[in-house]
Amino acid sequence: MIDTTWVIILSFLLFAIGTFGLLSRRNLLFILLSLEIMLNGIILLFIAASNLHGNNDGQIMYLLVLTLAASEVAVGLALVVQIYKQQQNLDVDTLTKLRG
C-alpha cells in the first residue's frame, strides 16, 4: 500500500500544476482544464486525510467536490462553446465583453 505522505505530496503537486496552468495559460479551455486538475488535487487530499484519520468524512467530501466539479465542467464548457461561436477565439486577453 502507498504511504499517505506520498499521496499528500501528489495532491499538492497536482494542485501546484493546476495553479501554474491557471496563471500561465491564456486559453479559456486550458484554464478550465487547470481548474479541474486543481480540484482533483483537492479531492485526493480529502481522501488521504480521511485515510490518515480513519474516518469517512473525506470520502463524503470527495462526492461533494466531484459533484461540484461535474457541474462546473458542464457550465464552463457550455460557456466556452458559446464564446467560441460568437468570438471565434478563446484567448482571455482578447475577450473583453460578451454580447447577448
Swiss-Prot record:
<feature type="transmembrane region" description="Helical">
    <location>
        <begin position="28"/>
        <end position="48"/>
    </location>
</feature>
<keyword id="KW-0830">Ubiquinone</keyword>
<dbReference type="GO" id="GO:0042773">
    <property type="term" value="P:ATP synthesis coupled electron transport"/>
</dbReference>
<dbReference type="InterPro" id="IPR039428">
    <property type="entry name" value="NUOK/Mnh_C1-like"/>
</dbReference>
<keyword id="KW-0874">Quinone</keyword>
<keyword id="KW-0520">NAD</keyword>
<keyword id="KW-0997">Cell inner membrane</keyword>
<protein>
    <recommendedName>
        <fullName>NADH-quinone oxidoreductase subunit K</fullName>
        <ecNumber>7.1.1.-</ecNumber>
    </recommendedName>
</protein>
<dbReference type="GO" id="GO:0050136">
    <property type="term" value="F:NADH:ubiquinone reductase (non-electrogenic) activity"/>
</dbReference>
<comment type="similarity">
    <text>Belongs to the complex I subunit 4L family.</text>
</comment>
<keyword id="KW-1278">Translocase</keyword>
<keyword id="KW-1003">Cell membrane</keyword>
<dbReference type="Pfam" id="PF00420">
    <property type="entry name" value="Oxidored_q2"/>
</dbReference>
<keyword id="KW-0472">Membrane</keyword>
<comment type="subunit">
    <text>NDH-1 is composed of 13 different subunits. Subunits NuoA, H, J, K, L, M, N constitute the membrane sector of the complex.</text>
</comment>
<dbReference type="GO" id="GO:0048038">
    <property type="term" value="F:quinone binding"/>
</dbReference>
<feature type="transmembrane region" description="Helical">
    <location>
        <begin position="60"/>
        <end position="80"/>
    </location>
</feature>
<keyword id="KW-0812">Transmembrane</keyword>
<feature type="transmembrane region" description="Helical">
    <location>
        <begin position="4"/>
        <end position="24"/>
    </location>
</feature>
<keyword id="KW-1133">Transmembrane helix</keyword>
<keyword id="KW-0813">Transport</keyword>
<dbReference type="GO" id="GO:0030964">
    <property type="term" value="C:NADH dehydrogenase complex"/>
</dbReference>
<comment type="function">
    <text>NDH-1 shuttles electrons from NADH, via FMN and iron-sulfur (Fe-S) centers, to quinones in the respiratory chain. The immediate electron acceptor for the enzyme in this species is believed to be ubiquinone. Couples the redox reaction to proton translocation (for every two electrons transferred, four hydrogen ions are translocated across the cytoplasmic membrane), and thus conserves the redox energy in a proton gradient.</text>
</comment>
<dbReference type="InterPro" id="IPR001133">
    <property type="entry name" value="NADH_UbQ_OxRdtase_chain4L/K"/>
</dbReference>
<dbReference type="GO" id="GO:0005886">
    <property type="term" value="C:plasma membrane"/>
</dbReference>
